[in-house]
Amino acid sequence: MKTKFVQATLAVALVIGLMQSCKPKNSSDASVGDAEKAYVAPGKYDEFYNFVSGGFSGQLSVYGLPSGRLFRVIPVFSVDPEKGWGYNEETKPMLNTSHGFVPWDDLHHTEMSQTNGEVDGRWVFGNANNTPRIARIDLKTFKTAEIIELPNSGGNHSSPFITENTEYVVAGTRFSVPADYSNGDVAI
């Protein structure tokens, strides 16, 4: 009986000792280094924002840097039941193509709008890789404002490219498609 009491007492003392040894000496020890450099307090703004293509999800993600916080996932080329994207009368027509309703695509590259060659933060453009489409996402609302289908194009992988005042969004293609001169230019 005495042995069990001594063993229990030693076990409790060991646990208390371990718990005390794990505490930092002061609170500043726990928050120095690289983690502190990336910390952005609640209510404060990140210095940069990263607009990341979602690939096969067809969505655009917005992250704050340096915090790494995910601020929003914007549906672009795919339906999103959570946000109603692609289901209501306002957004469903945006997913129509000349081949019918295409409720999915591979959002690949993004490009920011520019004024005098400087990024102005009005819009983000993104290309669809599977169908020849480019989307314009409005950065005032963080919603897809427009999707256009590109004539004479297939496999729109490498674009969009923006002119210095965003007058034109230029698309690159991997496959040639015969020209359709009757439709002409597509304004943004």
Locations of the language-model features?
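Beta-propeller domains
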Residues: 59-95, 126-151
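Repeated scaffold domains used in trafficking and secretory/extracellular systems
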Residues: 37-39, 82-87, 103-115, 152-162
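C-terminal motif of bacterial Sec signal peptides marking the signal peptidase cleavage site
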Residues: 18-21
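Short glycine/acidic-enriched loop and turn motifs that connect beta-strands
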Residues: 57-58, 131-132, 175-179
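Conserved beta-propeller blade signature
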Residues: 49-52, 123-126, 168-170
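Short, conserved, GDST-rich strand-edge loop motifs in beta-rich repeat architectures
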Residues: 36-48, 109-112, 121, 171-188
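Asp-box/WD-like beta-propeller blade repeats and closely related beta-sheet repeat scaffolds
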Residues: 139-188
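Bacterial signal peptide processing site
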Residues: 23-25
